[in-house]
């Protein structure tokens, strides 16, 4: 035992016997069938320790998903960003959690601009789409304790499931579970489950949108494009390859009339997955469309995912492009153009720091590289 923190014993990570012990102990859980790890208090151990730990875990169980808690991290705080980018696992996105909670509680002004502020920092991360997002957890009052309105909770859940990141839902949130005693502070934020209602509006909403995440890669891999925003109304799209999702959220008590252009959705007639209302996009525009107060709308254009014996997700970070430029992959196989730049596989823009591509292969061994655009070149 090395130190004491918050009433808990901590250990000396410099001791190789401890490091070997903790790695072997967690590997036993993986062998028992555990398929993901949530790690506590990342920031109290050095980056090199987590690099060693995550390397050992992923070597033991390839494909393991890991994320950890860097308590109350913010994308404008460099130390937490360094952890997110260098420890080999994702982290909980406290910044976006705060943005969503401030948006609906009014604890800080700005409404949806609080959310947009956080998203504008996405390029500081190497894997923003892998940040684990949430709106409440065991270390803070539940959402309903600070915003006692189930309609607002439903709107927050729409954001949680359609914005970038991997959504993490606190138990009971889908049942409107809450105990506001003492402002919902610990231990009142951890009540026993009172309901298992699979017909509640919140349960069905979450079920619908999580099903959409499985079907539409724009939500798991795509870029974010804001088409309209003010304090009370938010219209954005998520886009990846030929897939797209459009989301409209109105947290005002009053209806909002939408007049928006440059919406990155294919033109066509859609049906909202939440309300069942029709939505028509023409020339990238939505004009004179009424969105009721305290409601959200989600429409989806589901493209064709890449299918092949082997599907590889490529990602490039750290290369900033200019408008009109793109990044592509070339390699020694048919799928990557046999080193011919004219036949290279073009990647998808996610943010200033991230380009992604899903490529299907008919074989499992290949050589590849990622060419950079030249000045004045369009590809």
Language-model regions, residue ranges each:
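Chitinase-like catalytic core of GlcNAc-active glycosidases
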Residues: 1-31
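Active-site-proximal helices and loops of the catalytic beta/alpha 8
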Residues: 24-27, 35-127, 131, 148-150, ...
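Substrate-binding cleft of secreted/luminal carbohydrate-active enzymes
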Residues: 165-177
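A short, amphipathic beta-strand motif
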Residues: 312-318
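Solvent-exposed beta-strand/loop surfaces of large extracellular or lumenal domains
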Residues: 273-285, 340-345
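C-terminal beta-strand-rich structural cap/linker in extracellular carbohydrate-active enzymes
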Residues: 282-308
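Aromatic-rich carbohydrate-binding modules that target alpha-glucans
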Residues: 319-364, 374, 379
């Amino acid at each position: 035992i090395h130190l004491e923190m918050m009433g808990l014993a901590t250990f000396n990570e410099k001791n190789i016997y401890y490091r070997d012990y903790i790695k072997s102990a967690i590997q036993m859980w993986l062998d028992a069938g555990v398929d993901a790890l949530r790690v506590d208090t990342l920031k109290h151990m050095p980056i090199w320790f987590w690099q060693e730990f995550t390397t050992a875990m992923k070597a033991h169980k390839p494909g393991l998903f890991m994320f950890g808690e860097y308590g109350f991290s913010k994308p404008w705080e460099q130390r937490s960003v360094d952890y997110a980018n260098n420890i080999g696992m994702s982290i909980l996105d406290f910044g976006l959690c705060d943005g969503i909670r401030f948006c609906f509680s009014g604890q800080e002004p700005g409404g949806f601009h609080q959310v947009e502020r956080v998203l504008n920092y996405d390029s500081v991360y190497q894997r923003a789409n892998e940040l684990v997002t949430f709106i409440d957890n065991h270390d803070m009052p539940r959402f309903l304790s600070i915003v006692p309105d189930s309609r607002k909770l439903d709107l927050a859940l729409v954001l949680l499931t359609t914005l970038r990141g991997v959504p993490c839902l606190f138990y009971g949130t889908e049942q409107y579970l809450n105990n506001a005693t003492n402002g919902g502070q610990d231990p009142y934020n951890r009540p026993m489950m009172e309901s298992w209602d699979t017909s509640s509006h919140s349960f069905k909403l979450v079920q619908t949108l999580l099903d959409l995440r499985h079907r539409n890669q724009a939500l798991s891999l795509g870029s974010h494009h804001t088409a309209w925003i003010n304090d009370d109304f938010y219209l954005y799209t998520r886009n990846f390859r030929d897939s797209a999702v459009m989301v409209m959220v109105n947290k005002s008590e009053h209806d909002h009339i939408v007049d928006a252009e440059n919406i990155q959705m294919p033109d066509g007639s859609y049906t909202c997955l939440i309300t069942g209302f029709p939505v028509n996009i023409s020339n990238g525009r939505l004009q004179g469309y009424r969105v009721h107060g305290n409601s959200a709308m989600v429409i989806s254009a589901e493209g064709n995912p890449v299918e092949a014996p082997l599907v590889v997700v490529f990602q490039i970070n750290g290369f900033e492009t200019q408008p009109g430029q793109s990044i592509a992959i070339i390699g020694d196989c048919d799928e990557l153009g046999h080193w011919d730049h004219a036949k290279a596989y073009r990647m998808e823009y996610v943010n200033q720091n991230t380009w992604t591509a899903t490529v299907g292969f008919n074989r499992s061994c290949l050589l590849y590289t990622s060419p950079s655009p030249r000045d004045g070149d369009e590809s």
